[in-house]
């Protein structure tokens, strides 16, 4: 994982995605996305070249995507959920099928992500993968003389009040692996298994300083000395903390780690489809990919594009083309009973 964000000379790449044509008629894009995916460093060149103005609203959990679209989908043109949620939006009829022949760099994307059931279904494409990584754990180096290797550290009573967990149902997954072994299929847990997971997470609650919702919130918890250890969006928050000279260490637990991939989707009946398609092409172009990776420290979906801006050491550090690493992660997919998982997680948070 990255200890600091990459410095990438985007200007040397040029406006490859949208800069080869004249600026189109102006349009607007309202997007619902994660922090880091609409940084001005790469959004402004897109806006200048395309004539499309982008406005972002940020989420802290995948559960926000269906909730916000179901109650006001017309407010957004594009969304970027993880691939365990893209299929939910498809089933709800909230997103458009895409013509991959109009996506210039589609065939350069990793096949594992192009063919993921959250991206392609029934011979149609419903998402454009942009970035991927792990749900790692991270800790303040000076607080742990002995480096932790297991997720069980998150239940260590000596760390009471110094632990933070992501406010997301995926906390169920790592807890299930601890209880039932790392080979358990965490997306099809039985009622009995989910009850045991709930009990384990409720037992953890007195140790939790706060369930974090956004990258910025977690960074502030560390910067203020309120927490010493948490789970994390691998590479991103640790890089933000490194910029404040706070030395963090990331690790993948011996119980195995979640893998995630995020994909942009076009909202059903968007009136701004032309600008939306320009953005979808841009985010998987050399400039878009290098911009996203440079800001977030995540791995990119288009390794061909990234070879133009990453050194060989950076490319290796991000596990680009490291299929052994990719396959070692438990890549998210939609739980068989997603509503039940959300119910369990909400019950954990509500427990006294």
Map each language-model feature to its residues:
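Periplasmic-binding protein-like
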Residues: 194-204, 244-268
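A ligand-binding cleft/hinge motif common to bilobed small-molecule-binding domains
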Residues: 85-88, 229-247
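Early extracytoplasmic/lumenal segment of secretory-pathway proteins
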Residues: 26-88
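Mature extracytoplasmic/periplasmic domains
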Residues: 262, 267-326
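Paired acidic/hydrophobic, glycine-rich loop segments that form the ligand-binding mouth/hinge
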Residues: 76-81, 211, 228-233, 249-250
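Extracytoplasmic ligand-binding site segments that recognize negatively charged/polar headgroups
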Residues: 80-86, 90-219, 223
């Amino acid at each position: 994982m990255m200890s600091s964000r990459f410095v990438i000379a985007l200007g040397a790449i040029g406006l490859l995605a949208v800069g080869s044509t004249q600026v189109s008629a102006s349009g607007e894009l309202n997007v619902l996305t994660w922090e880091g995916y609409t940084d001005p460093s790469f959004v402004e060149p897109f806006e200048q070249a395309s004539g499309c103005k982008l406005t972002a609203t940020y989420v802290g959990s995948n559960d926000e995507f269906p909730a916000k679209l179901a109650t006001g989908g017309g407010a957004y043109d594009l969304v970027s959920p993880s691939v365990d949620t893209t299929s939910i939006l498809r089933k709800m009829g909230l997103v458009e099928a895409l013509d991959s022949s109009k996506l210039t760099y589609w065939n350069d994307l990793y096949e594992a992500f192009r063919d993921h059931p959250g991206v392609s279904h029934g011979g149609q494409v419903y998402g454009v993968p942009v970035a991927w990584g792990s749900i790692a754990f991270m800790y303040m180096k000076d607080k742990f003389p002995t480096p932790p290797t297991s997720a069980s550290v998150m239940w260590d009573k000596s760390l009471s009040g110094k632990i933070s967990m992501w406010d997301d149902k995926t906390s169920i997954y790592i807890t299930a692996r601890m209880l039932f072994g790392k080979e358990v299929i965490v997306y099809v847990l039985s009622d009995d298994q989910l009850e045991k997971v709930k009990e384990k997470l409720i037992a953890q609650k007195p140790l939790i300083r706060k369930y974090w919702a956004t990258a910025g919130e977690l960074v502030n918890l560390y910067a203020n000395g309120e927490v010493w250890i948490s789970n994390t969006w691998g590479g991103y928050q640790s890089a933000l903390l490194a910029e404040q000279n706070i030395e963090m260490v990331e690790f993948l637990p011996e119980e195995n780690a979640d893998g995630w991939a995020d994909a942009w989707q076009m909202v059903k009946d968007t009136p701004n489809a032309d600008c939306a398609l320009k953005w979808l092409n841009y985010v998987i172009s050399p400039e878009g990919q290098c911009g996203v990776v440079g800001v977030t420290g995540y791995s990119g979906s288009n390794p061909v594009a990234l070879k133009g801006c990453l050194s060989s050491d950076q490319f290796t550090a991000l596990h680009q083309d490291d299929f052994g690493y990719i396959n070692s992660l438990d890549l998210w997919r939609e739980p068989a009973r997603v509503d039940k998982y959300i119910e369990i997680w909400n019950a954990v948070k509500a427990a006294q």
